[in-house]
Amino acid sequence: MEQDKKNAKVGQSSPPYADSPNVTANGGTAGGRRHRARRKEDKPRQERELMLRCMYHTVPGRVLLKMLSGRRFSALCGRFMDSSLSRPLIRRFVRKNHIDLNEYTATRYRSFNDCFTRRIRAEMRPIPHNPRALIAPCDGRLSAYRISDGLVMPIKQSWYSVSDLLGGDPIAEAYRNGVCLVFRLCVDNYHRYCYIDNGTKGRNVFLPGQLHTVRPIALSRIPVFIRNCREYTVMDTAAFGPVTQIEVGALLVGKILNHDAEARVHRGAEKGMFLYGGSTIVLLLREGAADLPDALFEKTARGEETPVRMGEILGYAHKK
């Protein structure tokens, strides 16, 4: 049974999607309908990719990028997004990203950021009862990396040391030969995140920096995770021992809001949230802390990301 758990596929707790009939009542095929829906869904992402390609690959774009990636511009944008003046943006954002507001605790919002940080209904992100389950702290696209003996890992064509990620904190040594899990959140993802286990947490450490996008187009050109502003927390967890969680800001994300200072925490409880934009969460686990499916690392090595939801089972604590 344990072997079955170990080899379980990431995504096992996601709700299954029912297949549509092959032929619709009006004679059209369900496959064609799904294709049109996918095409419509991909259009906003394609528009964003085109804009970012211009910003990172052209001289005028890089001039604009220098202004947009600064914290001063992000703070100005944040003030607007917090104000009632931003409310007209909500309807288009919801429609463009196919967000079902019925999945959330509120359907009316005071500002754009109020909508962006909307709280989801508990039943939409159930937390598994198995105390050994390693869960995703957030919605997003997951990549998994093994940390080499030299505390270095290749993430999206850039090499990072754990020490650099943590601003030189000596705790980096605890993750020698461990695992690094990177969760990339897009604008259409749920932007609140939770604790992965019961335990105690230390203080929140903020490291100032810039605010580049966390999309692959930037990750392949700039060492984003050590350039961007970020905040990390060291947690002593019941099932996995010491775990460090890093929240990384991104383009136009000027605020990372963590709720607790040093405290006892519980798995599934809300840890914090990002304000407007895409963003990233990085989890560092020590060697042997958890058993994760090899398929996850193989998929990452092929340059593919795995969509996950907050509370989804990724693996299990290593049985001693």
Where are these regions (language model features)?
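Contiguous, well-folded functional domains in the mature portion of proteins
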Residues: 2-11, 16-320
